[in-house]
Structures are given as C-alpha cells and as structure tokens.
C-alpha cells in the first residue's frame, strides 16, 4: 500500500479510537444511572485501571516489536470495543471492574500506534508522521468531547446514548485496525538497521538474515540502549521528574470526575467542553514553549519547581471549592501547566538523547510513573480510604514535595554558580 494511504489509515484509526464521548460523563453515568456510590467507584473500580495498565505495559512494550505492531493495534482496538460493550450491557460493580481491566490493556498497547508508523515511513518523515498521528488523537478527543457536551448540555440525549455512540466508534476502530497493512519482519529489520546507521546494502543483509536475527538485534539493542540512557545524569534527572509528574497527573485525571460528582448533577453539565478545551489550549502552549530560547538545562529546575507549586495550589483550591466553575478552570490550568512542563522536558531530552531511544525512555518512565501511582493508590485509597476531597489535599502536598526537591537542585546549582563567579 502507498505510504500516504497508510498515513491516512493510521490517522483515521487514531481519531476514531479516541472518539469516546462517554468519557467526560463516565462518573456521572456510573454514579447516577448504575447507582454506584462514590466510595465503591473510588476504592473498588477506578484503581483497577492503574494496576491493569502497570501489569500490561512492559509485555506490550516488548511484544510490539516481537509481534510486528499490527496485532497490538488490533488488540488495542478490540480492548476498547470490549470496554464499551460492557458499558452498554454491564450493570454490576463486577462488570465495571472487568471494564477497567480492558481499559488498562488498551492504554498500555497504545505504544504500538506510534511505533507502527515509524516502520511505514522513511526516517526523513518521522517528524511529520509524529505530528499527524498526535494531531489525529487530539482531533478525535476534541470531537468526541464537544459532541458529548452538545448532546448532554442541550438535553438531547442520555448518558446511555453516549455509550452506544462510543461503541459504534470502537467497532469502526476495530475494522480500521484490521485493514491496516501488516508489517513483514524483513521490513521492520531493515528499518532498524537503517535507524542504527548500519552501512552496506541493507536489503542484502536482510535477505541473508532470519526472523531470529531480527529478534536478537532487538533484545541486544534493548540492553545496550538501557545502559546508554541512564549513564547520563541529565537524562536521569529529567526522567525522575517525568515519572513523578506523570504519576500524579494520571491520578488527578483519573479521579477529577469523582470530585466534580460531589456537586449536584445539574452542575456537571459542562464536563464535555472542559475536557475538549484542554487539547485546544495545550496546542498553543506547546508551540509557545518550543519557541522560547531558554537554556532549560540551567533554568529547568526552577521552572519545574514553580510549575509544581502552581499545580499544588490548583489542586488544593479544587479540594476546598464547591463551585463547579472553579473546579473546571483549575482542572484546565492544571492540565496546561502539565503540558508546558512536559514539553520542556521532552525538548531538553531531545538534545541529550538519540531519537531512537525516545520510545524506550518513554516506556520506562511510564512504567515507573504507574508503579508510583499504584503505591499512591494503595496508600491513599485502599489503606487510608480517604474521601475524594482529602485525596486532592494529599495530591497537592505531593506536588509541594516535588517542588521542594527541584528547588533544592536549583539552589545547589545557583549557589555553585554564585561562588564560582565570586571567586573569579
């Protein structure tokens, strides 16, 4: 299949699989329609996604290359399909717990979505391929959330109808995943040889090799890449921040709807537009950050500390406020700050890391973030059994601890610079 057709298909798949209008009103559906309490959802249902995602991530990361990408895409689409089959037909707590297992599987295998296109396009097209595939995800989410807002805000339909619309979209996503062209091991092997700057006639090398040679190259390269990544203290520092920041970000986004749900149902009618605004505001914030001519190796610690303090303040405000507009705006600003700091982290790593290692680093950092989130969930929800508002106080304090750590790092650097300047 021609390259542009593959690009169109994978972007269509990305947009359709993200077209899930249920999501902004997921808690409202489970709480009001299925009659599940906040405590039940908080302690028995939602934590399962974290554990499922954590357990599935490493196998998904390894098997993406072993199974040559497409099977993992189909698995992702089918997992989302099963989620919404359960949303439509499942009414019990047990069914919602099974749903969270499939949801964890789906989110863990999303790594195949980005890996697939890099095999199908030339190295010179990686940047545009990344832009298009990421844009497709944002477009799908925005359209889904905007539609949900329109239908619910105008009282045109019920939460159950949103589930049916999402199920139809997931059915189409399965179809699109199935018709995507597969990847031959020789095609993937040649691409890895090219990415590793192997000299000579690549097609001839591939023709003289076997599938086991391809696997051997993958696993040997994995070991060498792990060693290459964490020898660099700068990469290690930014990876620590990425894991710490992503951990609490996942937790906040997973439980924000529960916090909104503490207010009367009539106040929760703008969940859709709130979620839709996040990617729209995140895009210009991302572009502005990329244009700033700042040495983030020097000033990044200070920015991360200030950003974490801002996020701590927003979460604490959310924990105390009973006004839905305040909760919505605080959530939007929290997400935008996360987008800004994440963009800075990624751009800083880009100067210190071979682009071939981004996927590996992202996978490891995500795994560590999920491991930390699992511990946080176990302590805050399973052990302490905190209600949702005290939970957000804890999350606010978490950000303050992160801010304190990076403020110390910046202080050490600034002190050394000051004494060095004074000495000279």
Swiss-Prot record:
Residues bearing carbohydrate: 35, 254
Transmembrane segments annotated in the record for this chain: 48-68, 71-91, 99-119, 136-156, 164-184, 233-253, 299-319, 324-344, 361-381, 392-412
Gene3D superfamilies, per the entry: MFS general substrate transporter like domains
A GO cellular component entry from the record: plasma membrane
GO biological process, one term: transmembrane transport
InterPro entries: Folate_carrier, MFS_trans_sf, ThTr-1
Keywords tagged on the record: Folate-binding, Glycoprotein, Membrane, Transmembrane, Transmembrane helix, Transport
Membrane topology: Multi-pass membrane protein
Molecular function GO labels: folic acid binding; vitamin transmembrane transporter activity
Subcellular location(s) of the protein: Membrane
Function recorded in the entry: Unlike folt-1, does not appear to act as a folate transporter.
Similarity remark: Belongs to the reduced folate carrier (RFC) transporter (TC 2.A.48) family.
Protein known as: Folate-like transporter 2
Organism: Caenorhabditis elegans
């Amino acid at each position: 299949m021609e390259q542009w057709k593959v690009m169109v298909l994978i972007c269509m798949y990305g947009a359709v699989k993200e077209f899930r209008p249920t999501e902004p009103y997921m808690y409202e559906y489970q709480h009001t329609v299925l009659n599940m309490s906040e405590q039940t959802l908080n302690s028995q249902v939602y934590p399962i996604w974290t554990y499922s995602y954590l357990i599935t991530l490493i196998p998904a990361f390894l098997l993406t290359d072993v199974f040559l990408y497409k099977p993992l895409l189909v698995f992702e689409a089918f997992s989302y399909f099963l989620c919404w089959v359960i949303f439509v037909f499942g009414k019990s707590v047990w069914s919602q717990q099974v749903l969270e297992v499939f949801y964890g599987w789906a989110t863990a295998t999303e790594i195949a979505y980005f890996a697939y296109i890099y095999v199908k396009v030339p190295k010179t097209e990686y940047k545009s391929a990344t832009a298009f595939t990421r844009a497709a995800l944002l477009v799908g989410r925005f359209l889904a959330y905007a539609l949900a807002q329109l239908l619910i805000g105008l009282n045109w339909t019920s939460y159950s109808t949103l589930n049916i619309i999402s199920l139809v979209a997931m059915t189409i996503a399965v179809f699109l995943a199935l018709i995507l062209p597969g990847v031959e091991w020789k095609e993937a092997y040649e691409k890895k040889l090219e990415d590793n700057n192997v000299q000579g006639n690549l097609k001839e090398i591939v023709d003289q090799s076997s599938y086991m040679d391809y696997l051997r190259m993958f696993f040997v390269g994995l070991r060498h890449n792990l060693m290459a990544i964490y020898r660099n203290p700068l990469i290690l520092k930014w990876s620590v921040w990425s894991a710490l920041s992503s951990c609490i970000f996942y937790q906040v986004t997973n439980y924000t709807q529960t916090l909104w749900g503490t207010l009367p149902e009539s106040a929760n009618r703008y969940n859709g537009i709130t979620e839709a605004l996040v990617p729209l505001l995140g895009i210009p914030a991302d572009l502005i950050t990329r244009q700033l001519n700042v040495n983030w190796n020097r000033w990044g610690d200070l920015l991360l500390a200030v950003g974490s303090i801002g996020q701590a303040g927003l979460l604490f405000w959310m924990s105390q406020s009973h006004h839905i507009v305040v909760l919505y705006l605080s959530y939007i600003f929290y997400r935008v700050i996360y987008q800004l700091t994440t963009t800075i982290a990624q751009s800083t790593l880009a100067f210190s890391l071979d682009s071939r290692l981004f996927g590996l680093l992202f996978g490891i950092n995500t795994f560590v973030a999920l491991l930390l989130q699992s511990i946080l969930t176990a302590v805050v929800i399973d052990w302490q059994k905190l209600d949702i508002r005290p939970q957000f106080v804890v999350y606010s304090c978490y950000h303050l601890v992160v801010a304190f750590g990076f403020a110390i790092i910046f202080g050490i650097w600034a002190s050394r610079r000051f004494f060095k300047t004074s000495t000279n």
